[in-house]
Amino acid sequence: FLLLIIGVLPVYAQKKSKEKIYRLPDDLETLAGDPALLKKPEGLTVAAYAFPNYHASALHNKIYSQGWTEYNLIRSARPWFEGHQQPRTPLLGELDESKPSTWETYNKLCKQSGIDVLIWDWYWYDGKPCLHEALENGFLEASNTKDVKFACMWTNHPWYVLYPTKRTDGSNAYPPSFDAP
């Protein structure tokens, strides 16, 4: 999940006493300095995507290596230009998305940040769900799951390997075909 949405200020930021609409990223410094400027319009539902790739899974074990997660990419990031600070460390550390305690933290942060709904990528390959552990074992088992609604988005595409790994040459999509339940 790490999702890179936790703690992000919503784009709907608006000042109560003025008609000015604040826009990100231009007004980020102003908004971050004064949380009173943030106001969620009545009836607006804010959703964020949940990409379940920060936990060990059978899919990763098959394509990459045993225990591989997206954190491997974060750790191996290198600067592309002067001033580009890489690798970066996740603010909360490397949390395992398949654990309810991780989602208790994320759900609390979502609620505090005005995020109402998480839209989960849902993968189905080789006749079974893939990368489902974060939703089924983590999010749905968290004690505060009712604080954040959720929906599943069917990700009806092959898994593309877009970067070099130890176990593939990066040129093939996995699986060659996908199926539906």
Regions found by a protein language model. Name each.
Residues K15-P181:
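Glycan-processing catalytic domains of CAZymes
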Residues F1-K16:
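Bacterial Sec-dependent N-terminal signal peptides
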